[in-house]
């Protein structure tokens, strides 16, 4: 996604996170979600993780597996396609629609955690909030990201952040995940 950077890398680049770092970070975010939501408590909320395609869906799947392993609570997870809700639809090359998949219980009255790989301007998150409105009415919506690179254009913040990485606007942050790229890692490039 261009400047947000979640596909490939080019030019001068340097590693920000190794595969081991990515694994530890996803594990830490899973623990934070369990702790902050009291998910494993007697009155824990129904939590649904919805990944923003493409890499956010993979991260949501990994988080759900980790949360289940650490807490013993199975968390519903799926994908939320934001393509038709983007405000830059006519400015970027066309991209294929992704499937939106919502867990069987739906999202009404659930604590929904949107999951994305990189938080940059906040426009993808705004698009996800618009898409979410057409799917149901969650009780609470939170955001989890692997990397927050700053430069917000909208008043949004993530509750769960793997790594804060100050960047310039001329740099791109690329999250690599084994399921898509053959290996895990995060690189920054100019």
From Swiss-Prot:
Family per record: Belongs to the purine/pyrimidine phosphoribosyltransferase family. PyrR subfamily.
One GO molecular-function entry: uracil phosphoribosyltransferase activity
Function: Regulates the transcription of the pyrimidine nucleotide (pyr) operon in response to exogenous pyrimidines.
Entry EC number(s): 2.4.2.9
The encoding gene: pyrR
Catalytic activity field: UMP + diphosphate = 5-phospho-alpha-D-ribose 1-diphosphate + uracil
Pfam families attached to this UniProt entry: Pribosyltran (PF00156)
Lineage: superkingdom: Bacteria
Keywords carried by this UniProt record: Glycosyltransferase, Transcription, Transcription regulation, Transferase
Motif placement: PRPP-binding: 112-124
Keyword Transferase part of the UniProt annotation: yes
Coiled-coil region list: none
Organism of this sequence: Mycobacterium avium (strain 104)
GO BP terms: regulation of DNA-templated transcription
Protein name: Bifunctional protein PyrR
PANTHER family cross-referenced by the UniProt entry: BIFUNCTIONAL PROTEIN PYRR
């Amino acid at each position: 996604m261009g400047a947000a950077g979640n596909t490939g890398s080019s030019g001068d680049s340097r590693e920000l996170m190794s595969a081991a770092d990515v694994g530890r970070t996803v594990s830490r975010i899973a623990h934070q979600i369990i702790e902050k939501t009291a998910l494993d408590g007697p009155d824990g909320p129904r939590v649904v993780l919805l990944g923003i395609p493409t890499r956010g869906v993979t991260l949501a799947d990994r988080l759900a597996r980790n949360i289940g392993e650490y807490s013993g609570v199975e968390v519903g997870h799926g994908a939320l396609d934001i393509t038709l809700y983007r405000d830059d639809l006519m400015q970027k090359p066309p991209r294929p629609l992704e499937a939106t998949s919502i867990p069987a219980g739906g999202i009404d009255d659930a604590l929904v955690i949107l999951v994305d790989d990189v938080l940059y301007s906040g426009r993808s998150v705004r698009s996800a909030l618009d898409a979410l409105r057409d799917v149901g009415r969650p009780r609470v919506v939170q955001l989890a990201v692997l990397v927050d690179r700053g430069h917000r254009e909208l008043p949004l913040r993530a509750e769960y952040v793997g790594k804060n990485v100050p960047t310039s606007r001329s740099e791109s942050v690329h999250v690599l995940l084994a399921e898509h790229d053959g290996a895990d890692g995060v690189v920054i490039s100019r």
